[in-house]
Amino acid sequence: MDNYTVLRVIGQGSFGRALLVLQESSNQTFAMKEIRLLKSDTQTSRKEAVLLAKMKHPNIVAFKESFEAEGYLYIVMEYCDGGDLMQRIKQQKGKLFPEDTILNWFIQICLGVNHIHKRRVLHRDIKSKNVFLTHNGKVKLGDFGSARLLSSPMAFACTYVGTPYYVPPEIWENLPYNNKSDIWSLGCILYELCALKHPFQANSWKNLILKICQGPIHPLPALYSCKLQGLVKQMLKRNPSHRPSATTLLCRGSLAPLVPKCLPPQIIREYGEQILDEIKISTPKNMKKQDSNRVRRALGEANSASMQEEERGRKCSHTELESTGTTPAGNALERAARGNPESGNPQEHGRHTSPASPHRPWWERHGPSSNVEALEKASILTSSFTAEDDRGGSVIKYEENARRQWVREPPEALLSMLKDADLSQAFQTYTIYRPGAEGFLKGPLSEDTASDSVDGDLDSVMLDPERFEPRLDEEDTDFEEDNENPDWVSELKKHVGYGDGPGGQLLGERA
């Protein structure tokens, strides 16, 4: 700390503090994360710094250095002087963002997410509070304290550290999650940018979870285009395999031609080749460009005629994520990076073909009643838990990631535990404690009176069939992570004393 002067505290959480510091040698300001080091988890706490140091991308908060002093780990990062995206949304006070601004920010976030996914990293806590802005228009993804570094592209994720408003359906179902779980959270951010509120609001855990899993999505304001509405719906599909990957979002459909426009020339010159390579999607063998019939045959589409009709009649519920051999964003970036913007025949780069994925299980379409049962009598408050929070940021690398057979909890389990539960500050917390709290689930973007009627009936959340429709694009890549303790619902029961009396703690805050 000898080379740094603390200017002020800019954030605080269960991990410790976030400080604005001045580096005396360079007279530059940086953000410094101060993490308490416990003897039992010192190595684990250091892994966030190791992971962050590996991420070099214009849309990821840059790592400066890390060091230890007096029982603390200090991670020095670039300071984003525009604050976080949550603060920016709240500053609007109901005034909608222009669509061009939303798309510019969203594409930059997607570029950052795509970068970490290409490196087999799951962020696990993507939310508007963890997206940072600069005064010169850059958007950067930060806070990798919950991230996991994977050693294999195909493994199941079993534990989840995140924020309830952004938790995808598969987690409430006690099912494994993968990179598409990050995409769900990304969809929630896009909805917040458009509507200035959370996509799902309720006054009970039961209805919140049911809405997340099967309820309809409240339409975006009429100001925004049909394509933007469809993009949100694609990212909030219940089945993870039906959600587009970050690469698909960037290289196909309406976002593709906008990617070069969201990056200043300096960034394109410095990172153009890297970004171009990251947004490539492998072309199936023997597939000719611009031949839609060959694309359909290569992807195993059973009914070409019906697919053509669906494409012609596509409305707001679908995005333009067709399987094509060319990517507009890639071509534009390559021309800019090579200093030849008028060239129409950019040199082909080698494509990386993803390994064949094992057969994926079919996801049932009913609500996550097991989780709702398990949390029936629990209340939620802002308090931190546990060893995972106390040890600060952590990254765990596994050498073996074998797929497992997953056994679902009985439908009554979580519903029973959540019955009569009160909700408070679920945006920041994931803690279950004994009943006694007042209030309802209220996040920073919640309306003053959160009613279940916002996006569903008070007593019954209607199923939205559109959220169960598969995407047309089947050429996509998923990767997942593994953990030695797969069943978080069982752990939840232990902490809340399910079956042995009233509750206790479950999970802690990830600020």
Curated annotation (Swiss-Prot):
Descriptive protein name: Serine/threonine-protein kinase Nek3
PANTHER family tied to this protein: SERINE/THREONINE-PROTEIN KINASE NEK3 (PTHR44984), SERINE_THREONINE-PROTEIN KINASE NEK3 (PTHR44984:SF1)
Bias (Gly residues): 498-511
Keyword Electron transport (UniProt): no
Span list, region Interaction with VAV2: 1-282
Subcellular location: Cytoplasm; Cell projection, Axon
Domain Protein kinase residue range list: 4-255
Catalytically driven reaction(s): L-seryl-[protein] + ATP = O-phospho-L-seryl-[protein] + ADP + H(+); L-threonyl-[protein] + ATP = O-phospho-L-threonyl-[protein] + ADP + H(+)
GO molecular function term, any single one: ATP binding
Main location: cytoplasm
InterPro entries: Kinase-like_dom_sf, Prot_kinase_dom, Protein_kinase_ATP_BS, Ser/Thr_kinase_AS
Native source organism of the sequence: Mus musculus (Mouse)
Subunit record text: Interacts with PXN, PRLR, VAV1 and VAV2 and this interaction is prolactin-dependent.
Residue segments, region Disordered: 299-370, 443-511
N-acetylmethionine, modified sites: 1
Enzyme's top EC category: transferase
Essential cofactor(s): Mg(2+)
